[in-house]
A protein has these predicted regions:
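Pepsin/retropepsin-fold aspartyl endopeptidases
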Residues: 1-257
Length: 257
């Protein structure tokens, strides 16, 4: 039975909606545990199902225990999404994500660390750590200060924790003058954020000048900054979970104002 997932590198678990789980006839495992799904600022309880078969583009997925939760998903033109494809599945592979061309390729993890992908476009290589939640985390520099970031294709906008923003010299008065937006997490939570313009964000050797970044109180366990879809949408990236490296192409367009 085909299902449509949102590619979400920031989600720790792959999640089906209750409606999708019922449609495909997914069954609960013999032994169940109390689990929770964590969002940007909250969590909600989940249950689990065992899939008889799970493939993506013809590639068999070895991990077939999937979470079921009423996750908050964005609207797409062809109808409702059936869930999130998260890091618990992605981490079995080296993942080549070409967002400008709307394409993803799953590669078997190499027996030795990948030297570099065979891309025509220029890119940067980033050494990372790998958290308990299967996030590849790595240092970036925001206004000259080293902080820790993850890539989250499920996040609409790049977001920084309020605590780190304050450490960078952003005051409450400055944030009060910034534009207010509402962030919605997959766990159903809503968070008020302020969009603040910083001087420079440096990822690898690739610098973005005058980036606009949302500042919000976040429930992040392994990062200070979430690099969202606004940052990665014009880039190609290779996530090598086995060798703990990320290869990131340079943006097709950079803000100059």
């Amino acid at each position: 039975v085909p299902v449509d997932f949102l590619l979400d590198t920031g989600a720790e678990r792959t999640v089906l909606t209750p409606a999708a789980a019922q449609r495909i006839g997914a069954q609960p495992p013999r032994i169940e545990f109390d689990r929770r799904m964590h969002g940007i600022a909250g969590s909600l309880p989940i249950r689990e199902v065992e899939l008889r078969r799970f493939t993506i583009g013809g590639v068999a997925i070895p991990w077939r225990r999937i979470a079921v939760a009423p996750a908050t998903l964005p609207s797409v033109f062809f109808g409702p999404l059936d869930g999130l494809l998260g890091a618990d599945v992605l981490s079995f592979f080296d993942v080549d994500i070409d967002l400008p061309r709307h394409r993803m390729i799953l590669h078997e993890q190499p027996s030795c660390p990948l030297a570099a992908p065979d891309w025509a476009e220029p890119f940067v290589a980033i050494d990372t750590g790998r958290s308990a939640g299967e996030h590849l985390f790595f240092p970036v520099h925001l206004d000259g200060r080293a902080i820790v970031a993850i890539i989250d294709t499920g996040a609409k906008i790049t977001t920084l924790s309020t605590k780190i923003a304050m450490a960078l010299g952003v005051s409450d008065a400055m944030l009060a003058r910034d534009r207010s937006i509402t962030l919605r997490g997959a766990a159903g939570e809503s968070v008020t954020a302020r969009v603040h313009r910083f001087s420079q964000l440096e990822v690898g050797r690739d610098a973005t000048h005058d980036p606009e970044i949302a500042v919000a109180t976040l429930n992040l366990r392994d990062a200070d900054l979430v690099l969202g879809f606004d940052f990665v949408s014009s880039r190609r990236m290779w996530l090598s979970y086995g060798s703990r490296r990320i290869f990131l192409s340079r943006a097709k367009r950079q803000r100059s104002d």
